[in-house]
Structures are given as C-alpha cells and as structure tokens.
C-alpha cells in the first residue's frame, strides 16, 4: 500500500518543479510576496494547486502563455494549501476577487488588473486559458 503522505509530497514536489521550470519564481513567505509585488511593471501570479485542473490545464497554460510578443515583466507563483501564509498575503492584493485555486492574477505596479479564476480554468482546454491570458498581456503588457 502506498503511503498517502509520501504520495502527496511527491505530487506537491512535481507541481512546484513544473511551474519553476516554466520560468516562474516561487514565493513561499509573505515577505517574498511583498517584495515581488512592490516591483514596477506587470506581474503574472499563478496560484498553484494540487488539483487535477492545475496539472492538466493551469500549469501548462502558465508555461505556454508567456511565449508571446507581449508578456508580463515578472512571473511568480504561490502554492495554495502549501505555502498558506504567502498565498494569504498574495490574495490580499486580489481585491474584488474571491480566493480560488488554481488561478492567475495580473498585477500592474502592485495593483490588481484582472484575474483568471478557477471557474475559467476548470472544464476548459489549456488553449482557451492561454488565449485569455494572452489577451490580457496584449492589453496590459509591453514587448519584452
């Protein structure tokens, strides 16, 4: 029989590695969130999760959406259910949006511009989420 904690630790490790290998910086403390969010420019925040729609839709969309002429200056991630304090601090910036994971938040100069919430991810194809993110990049980001 598989040890559940061992299994979940492996799932979490793989989820972390997948988003970091896509070029996102992990924010694991409230202080790291503060530091990242006070930077000028645009920041895409991927709220990571261990749910199926995170692995099958959100993380692939996070990886592929940034291959676009206009993209955010900064790519960061917090992990809901794992780095709880960092995630809670990040969500304080997402005014007007209820907590959801997985999700994406686009910030400009530390202020929320828009979000792609779980209900816009779950049940959708990765390409639909990529297209939505890239439309936000087109409106709010500059060519890098």
From Swiss-Prot:
Q: Record's InterPro entries?
A: BrxB/BrxA (IPR009474)
Disulphide-bonded residues: none
> Would you say which domain of life the source belongs to?
Bacteria
Pfam families from the entry?
A: Disulph_isomer
GO-annotated biological processes: cell redox homeostasis
Query: Family, per the entry?
Result: Belongs to the bacilliredoxin family.
UniProt name for this protein:
Bacilliredoxin BC_4151
